[in-house]
Amino acid sequence: MADAAIHGHEHDRRGFFTRWFMSTNHKDIGVLYLFTGGLVGLISVAFTVYMRMELMAPGVQFMCAEHLESGLVKGFFQSLWPSAVENCTPNGHLWNVMITGHGILMMFFVVIPALFGGFGNYFMPLHIGAPDMAFPRMNNLSYWLYVAGTSLAVASLFAPGGNGQLGSGIGWVLYPPLSTSESGYSTDLAIFAVHLSGASSILGAINMITTFLNMRAPGMTMHKVPLFAWSIFVTAWLILLALPVLAGAITMLLTDRNFGTTFFQPSGGGDPVLYQHILWFFGHPEVYIIVLPAFGIVSHVIATFAKKPIFGYLPMVYAMVAIGVLGFVVWAHHMYTAGLSLTQQSYFMMATMVIAVPTGIKIFSWIATMWGGSIELKTPMLWALGFLFLFTVGGVTGIVLSQASVDRYYHDTYYVVAHFHYVMSLGAVFGIFAGIYFWIGKMSGRQYPEWAGKLHFWMMFVGANLTFFPQHFLGRQGMPRRYIDYPEAFATWNFVSSLGAFLSFASFLFFLGVIFYTLTRGARVTANNYWNEHADTLEWTLTSPPPEHTFEQLPKREDWERAPAH
C-alpha cells in the first residue's frame, strides 16, 4: 500500500499506442470501455432524437421515401428538414432501422459495456485489493471483441437490407419470421455483431468470477467484500449462464437465413415461438445484467453521502443473488399473448411478482441507510436519488404488467416502452452518471465543477420524466409501439414526450462538455479521499489517479476493515 502511494505520480513510460491499444491494465481497459460506450451512446441517442422528431406530430414529416432519390448524403440532410419534399411517402423501413439500431446498440454496446466492462474492470479489482484481473490478456481480447462487434453493428446500418434499402429493420429482438425473410446481409451483420458482443461479455464474465473468487485481499472473506464487487460478481454469473443461450438462438436464426434449416419456420416443421422462449430466457436476465452493477454503484454513493454504513449489508448481498436466480425463471411474462396455457400464465405471474421481494429489500435498505443520516446532496447523490425514484416507478409498472389479464391490453403499447425505459434505460443510465461523478476525480485526478454536475442532473431528470411518463398515458389510451405514424388523438402526449427527449439530448451534450472541461481544466485532486471518511473502500486509500501498478504490496486487513460489511 505504501509503495502504491509513493509511486502514484511516477511518469508512465508507456507510449500512447502501447497504453491504449495493447494494454492489459484493468484500469486502462475500464476507461476504454467507458469511452467507447459513450461514443456508441451518442449514436444511439441521436437515433432516439430522430424518432422523437418524427413522432412530434401526426403524419410523416421527416422519414420520406422521396429522400432516397437524392442520394445518401443529400437525402440525409433533406430528411432533417420537414418541408424538403411536398408529398411525403412514409419510409417505414427507415423507421424500423432506427428502432433496430437504437435497441441493439443500447442493449449490447452501451449500457453493459459501460457498467460491467467500464466500472467493473476499473473498480472491482480495486475494491477487493487485487493487483489486476486474473487474466489480463483475455481482458484486452474482451475489449477488442467488443469494438469489433460495435463496428459490425454500425456497418449493418449501411449494408443492403430489406425492400432494397440500407439497414436491418427487424427490431432488436430479431423475431422470426420477419428476421428469416428479410433480404440483404444487413441482418447477418447485426447477428454477427451480437455474437461478438456476447463473446466479449462471456470472456469478461469468466475473468470477473475468477478474479473475485481467487484474488481478494488476505483475510477478506466473501461477506466482507464491498457491494459493488458483489454486484459485478452476480452479474458475471448471469452473463455466463444467459448469453450462450442467446448465442444458440441467433446461430439457429443464421442457419435458417443462409443454410436452409427450418428451426423457426413452420413450413419445415419449425416454430417461431421456440425462438421467443430461447430469446427471453436470455432477455429477462439481461435486465438484471444491466441494472445490478448500477445497484452496486448506488449503494456506495448513498452510504458515502448519507454518511452512514449501508443498512443491512448481508440482506443486500443475498437480495442481489435472489434477483439473479429469480431472473432465470420468469422469462415468459414477455409472452403472455403468444399462446401460453392458463397454468403457465399463472406460474409466470406468481414468479414475476416474487422478484419484487428482493428488489424491495434493496429499495428499503437504501432508504434506511439515508434515514437519520447527515445527507449531503452532492452531484453523485442526486443521481443516486434519481435512480431510486425512476427504478421504483419502473418496478411498480412492472407489477402491473406482470398480470397476464392486464397485459392483454398493455402488450406492445407505449405503456411497456415507458416501463422498461424507466427500469433499464433511466435506471441504468442514472447509475452510470452516479458512478462517473462519484469516481471521475479518482480516475482522472481532476474534479468536475459541482454546479455543472447538478445542472446536468436536473436537465436529465426533468427531460427523462417528461419523455417517458406521458408514454404511460399513451399506452393506456391504446397507442401501439414501433409505429411511424399515429392518429391525432395521441398528438398531445407525443408532443410532450418529444420535448422531453430534446431536453434529455441537450443534457447529454452538456455532459460531454462537462467531461471535456473536467479532463482538461478541472480542479486537480490532491487528497486520496476527496469525499468523506464514509467513502471507505480501498480505492480511496490510493492516489488520484491510481498508479499504473495498483497494489505492489497486497492490502492488509486494517486497510479495508471499515468496508461496508461493518
Curated annotation (Swiss-Prot):
It catalyses: 4 Fe(II)-[cytochrome c] + O2 + 8 H(+)(in) = 4 Fe(III)-[cytochrome c] + 2 H2O + 4 H(+)(out). Residues 543-566 are annotated as: Disordered. GO terms for cellular component: plasma membrane; respiratory chain complex IV. Keywords: Cell membrane, Copper, Electron transport, Heme, Hydrogen ion transport, Ion transport, Iron, Membrane, Metal-binding, Respiratory chain, Translocase, Transmembrane, Transmembrane helix, Transport. The chain crosses the membrane at residues 29-49, 97-117, 141-161, 189-209, 227-247, 278-298, 310-330, 348-368, 381-401, 420-440, 455-475, 499-519. Disulfide bonds: none annotated. It is found in: Cell membrane. Pfam families: COX1. Fe(II)-heme a binds at H102, H421. Belongs to the heme-copper respiratory oxidase family. This is Cytochrome c oxidase subunit 1. It comes from Cereibacter sphaeroides (Rhodobacter sphaeroides). The gene is ctaD.
